[in-house]
């Protein structure tokens, strides 16, 4: 077996003007840097959506990806967001730290806006994704909708899944 080496760098630690590293241009630059340095591996931390405490080792789902890592500049290039919309939020003033509170407050509304502007092709891809991931996605979506509606502290064990779905439909 040939010896090789690599680097551990969380995606969140990549440079970004939007508060957190993404799978955008900086990720590609980092991969090119690794290749030029003779490194063969980029080890990353888990990519799930983080919960209270923002630890990648305590995600809401082991299947879902963290929406924070979606490249906003790619959404601008696709015409789903404007440069002004992406520049408007306060992403924090310390490039050495991720302010998860600011990220949560600003990024998710931008992603929702981008999806609302999506054309039929992207919507068809989202529908296909939902169908392909039907084993876990409906329950994850239900949980996240309940969390958004009622906050982080919920007594979900008091209700059946069907009762919870009815609560969301009424909200």
Predicted segments with their positions:
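Conserved AAA+ ATPase core "coupling" helix
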Residues: 148-171
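Acidic/aromatic-lined carbohydrate-recognition and catalytic surfaces
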Residues: 2-149
């Amino acid at each position: 077996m040939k010896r090789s080496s690599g680097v551990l760098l969380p995606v969140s630690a990549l440079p970004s003007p939007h508060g957190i590293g993404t799978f955008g241009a900086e990720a590609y630059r980092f991969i090119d840097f690794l290749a030029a340095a003779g490194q063969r591996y980029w080890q990353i931390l888990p990519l799930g959506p983080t919960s209270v405490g923002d630890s990648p080792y305590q995600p809401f789902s082991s299947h879902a990806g963290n929406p924070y890592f979606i490249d906003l500049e790619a959404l601008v290039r696709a015409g789903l967001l404007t440069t002004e919309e992406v520049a408007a939020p306060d992403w924090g003033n310390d490039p050495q730290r991720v302010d998860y509170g600011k990220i949560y407050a600003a990024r998710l509304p931008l992603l929702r806006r981008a999806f609302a502007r999506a054309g039929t092709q992207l919507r068809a891809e989202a529908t296909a994704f939902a169908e392909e991931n039907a084993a876990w996605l409906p329950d994850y979506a239900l949980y996240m909708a309940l969390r958004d509606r009622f906050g982080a502290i919920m007594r979900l064990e008091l209700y059946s899944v069907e009762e919870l779905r009815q609560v969301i439909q009424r909200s």
